[in-house]
Regions:
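Conserved, single-site charged/polar hotspot
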Residues: 1-134
Length: 134
């Protein structure tokens, strides 16, 4: 795999026989792996722009919450945060990221908690019907 930015190798804080590999990368470069990992290029440029803004907002929100500070990083590379894998960068996603550079969804001066999902099997439900809604 090829990743942008710097790779940091640190001992695991929970298991002395393991290491932790952390990719230190600028947010716009981070999005170049997240957007194509979360949404196919075939969805079109406007959908990719919306995805870029949602993904940027999500990452910034997690960063500001220091959700993983004790672990030494800001976001995970799985669906627990956003999928950040070795998906091939593509021109459409990169253009969408560049066209929305720096744009974040805000409420009361703070980034919103921009949760989204990449797979719904064609069905969604209003949050008010979810058994764990507030």
């Amino acid at each position: 795999p090829r990743y942008r930015g710097d790779m940091l190798i640190k001992p695991s804080k929970t298991n002395s026989k393991k290491i932790r590999v952390i990719n230190k990368v600028k947010i716009e470069d981070y999005l170049k792996q997240v957007v194509p990992s979360e949404m196919p290029e075939s969805f079109g440029v406007e959908a990719l722009k919306a995805q870029a803004v949602a993904a940027r907002t999500y990452a910034l929100s997690d960063y500001l919450k220091n959700r993983y500070e004790k672990d030494g990083f800001h976001v995970k590379d799985t669906t627990e945060s956003q999928v950040y894998n070795n998906a091939k960068e593509n021109e459409s996603s990169t253009k969408a990221i560049e066209a929305t550079s720096g744009k974040v969804l805000m409420n009361d001066g703070k980034p919103i908690d921009a949760k989204y999902f990449s797979t719904s099997s064609g069905f969604t439900e209003a949050a008010k019907y979810h058994p764990f809604s507030f």
